[in-house]
Amino acid sequence: MKLAYFSSLLPLALAAPASVVDPREPKEDITDRYLFSTPLPTFLEYREKENPDSLDWTSDGCTHASNNPFGFPFEPACQRHDFGYRNYQAQTRFESDSRYRIDLNFYNDMIFQCTDVSALRSCHGLADVYYAGVRMFGGFAKRDEMGAVVASATDPKESAEDLIAVYYTALQEYHQAVKADQADGLLPRL
């Protein structure tokens, strides 16, 4: 009898929304929970349902990122990164410390996305390049009169020269990883 009763509740449980948001919960708390405490696959379910609709779910994906010729699955990480930047900006709390946390979460999401990739060295290498790129250009980039990015107004502890050096080192290491993965037959030669 009990089994039949609980079995009849199963369709209702499966049809329930992925997340029930208390309408009294501040947007800032929801944003932080979705960014820093929610597994990426669960975040993507919330994003698909735009739950709650009071948050900014828009994303341009990885459009400003470096080339991804092997199609590493970074799009979900880029979507959550955009969610973080856009909502923190809308909530007027986008500053160097929060930006660092959002960027670090982006890096961790990319590493998670590499889990099922056979060319793990190259996937991790490109994650390093993307992370260095957002640290250098993300959020606070300054532009000259022609619209070109000239520097990044970042945390004073991160000089533009250091960020550029980290970016180019990551790029070099990525190219080395690609060559190694190609030699091992894990990536095609382009």
Swiss-Prot record:
Ca(2+) binds at A65, D82. It is found in: Lipid droplet; Secreted. GO terms for biological process: arachidonate secretion; lipid catabolic process; phospholipid metabolic process. It catalyses: a 1,2-diacyl-sn-glycero-3-phosphocholine + H2O = a 1-acyl-sn-glycero-3-phosphocholine + a fatty acid + H(+). Disulfide bonds join C62-C78. It comes from the Eukaryota. Disruption phenotype: Decreases the ability to penetrate the host cuticle and impairs the repression of host immunity genes. This is Secretory phospholipase A2. It comes from Beauveria bassiana (strain ARSEF 2860). The gene is PLA2.
